[in-house]
């Protein structure tokens, strides 16, 4: 059987679903359960990564230092991972994370902007740390563009590269084409896939990624994450095993960890609700959902139309101001712009 490495961002990406408010006890208990299941990598942090706790995107319940040290102490078999976005995280944040014993660093950038990771990947390379680079909102770039960006990231020092289906927009053939192109471009460098479940395709897309050559696959307990959630880890693992890929994970212990996560980490497991389906079809960042619904409701505009217009404009995270413009235009209170 071919080996795949499972990367579990339950304690980082899942934070988006609870406004980044997971406490240290919750982090420790899930980390211990994932470790008992022999999950290879357990990622922890604010949902937006190192240095991101703020009024702008949400204050975490604990500091980065406290989260990393708590989970580090809980892990005996699993490796400790963390995440950062250039613009939030800094070299100082990376340096402190190294001091806490982080084993795997992920640097996330927009699908066409690998150059933004150059400084941080170089810093981690020079520090002797394992650094990965993930290209987010990857449906907004062609297979060839993603392959080119991934190759650049490897040149900057990434020891694994891959894509995040941040909007949950892909179907399996989309994943096959993109992962295949990246694998061809980077050779023996491991390729990563991180799915979202807006269209209910996260597990199928992850299997397609593995079959196309991805060797690092992400999944969260109960799919814990914003909107429709991420790839459901305890479903992903046995499906991969049935598909001929070895994970090295203890299934019963993994199911126990998922049960614990449902009881202690989340108010309810995520599902592909109507707005999540629409945002996935439109190819729009799931984090826009609450703001779209709020502004559209106040203006008497159908939020589904707002999502599809944002998709036509290729809105990305950080462009929340576009929501205001689109709602105003659809309600007849604003002029049409050239971007429409």
Curated annotation (Swiss-Prot):
Disulphide bridges: none
Active site: 16 (proton acceptor)
Annotated Gene3D superfamilies: 1.10.8.60, Aldolase class I
Site description Transition state stabilizer, residues in chain: 12
EC number: 4.1.3.39
Matching SUPFAM superfamilies: Aldolase, post-HMGL domain-like
Cross-referenced PROSITE patterns: PYR_CT
Annotated GO biological process: catabolic process; L-leucine biosynthetic process
Keyword annotations: Aromatic hydrocarbons catabolism, Lyase, Manganese, Metal-binding
Species for this entry: Streptomyces griseus subsp. griseus (strain JCM 4626 / CBS 651.72 / NBRC 13350 / KCC S-0626 / ISP 5235)
Domain Pyruvate carboxyltransferase: 4-255
HAMAP family to which the protein is assigned, alphabetical: HOA
Record GO terms (molecular function): 2-isopropylmalate synthase activity; 4-hydroxy-2-oxovalerate aldolase activity; manganese ion binding
Lineage: Bacteria, Bacillati, Actinomycetota, Actinomycetes, Kitasatosporales
Protein name from the UniProt record: 4-hydroxy-2-oxovalerate aldolase
Keyword Endoplasmic reticulum (UniProt): no
InterPro entries, per database record: 2-IPM_HCS-like, 4OH_2_O-val_aldolase, Aldolase_TIM, DmpG_comm, DRE_TIM_HOA, PYR_CT
Domain of life: Bacteria
Catalytic activity: (S)-4-hydroxy-2-oxopentanoate = acetaldehyde + pyruvate
UniProt family annotation: Belongs to the 4-hydroxy-2-oxovalerate aldolase family.
Sequence positions that bind substrate: 12-13, 166, 194
NCBIfam families: 4OH_2_O_val_ald, PRK08195.1
Residue numbers binding Mn(2+): 13, 194, 196
């Amino acid at each position: 059987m071919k080996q795949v490495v499972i990367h579990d961002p339950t304690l980082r990406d899942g934070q988006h679903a609870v406004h980044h408010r997971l406490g240290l006890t919750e982090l420790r208990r899930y980390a211990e359960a994932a470790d008992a299941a022999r999950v290879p990598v357990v990622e922890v942090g604010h949902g937006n990564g190192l240095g991101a706790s703020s009024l702008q995107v949400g204050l975490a319940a604990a500091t980065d230092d406290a989260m990393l040290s708590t989970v580090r102490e809980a892990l005996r078999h699993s490796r400790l991972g963390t995440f950062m976005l250039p613009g939030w995280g800094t070299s100082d944040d990376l340096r402190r994370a190294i001091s806490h014993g982080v084993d795997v660093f992920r640097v996330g950038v927009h699908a066409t902007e690998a150059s933004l990771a150059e400084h941080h990947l170089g810093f981690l390379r020079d520090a002797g740390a394992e650094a990965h680079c993930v290209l987010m909102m990857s449906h907004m770039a062609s297979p060839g563009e993603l392959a080119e960006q991934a190759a650049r990231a490897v040149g900057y020092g990434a020891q694994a590269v891959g894509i995040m289906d941040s909007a949950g927009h892909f179907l399996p053939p989309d994943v096959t084409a993109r992962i295949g192109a990246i694998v061809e471009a980077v050779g023996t460098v491991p390729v990563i896939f991180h799915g979202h479940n807006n269209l209910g395709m996260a597990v199928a897309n992850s299997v397609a990624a593995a079959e196309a050559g991805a060797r690092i696959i992400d999944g969260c307990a109960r799919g814990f994450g914003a909107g429709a959630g991420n790839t459901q880890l305890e479903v992903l693992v046995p499906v991969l095993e049935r598909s001929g890929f070895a994970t090295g994970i203890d299934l019963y212990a993994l199911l126990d960890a998922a049960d614990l996560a449902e009881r202690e980490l989340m108010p309810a497991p995520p599902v592909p609700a109507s707005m999540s389906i629409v945002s996935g079809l439109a190819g729009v960042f799931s984090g826009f959902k609450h703001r779209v619904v709020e502004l559209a409701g106040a203006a008497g505009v159908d939020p589904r139309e707002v999502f599809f217009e944002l998709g036509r404009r290729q809105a990305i995270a950080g462009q929340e101001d576009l929501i205001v413009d689109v709602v105003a235009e659809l309600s007849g209170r604003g002029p049409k712009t050239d971007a429409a």
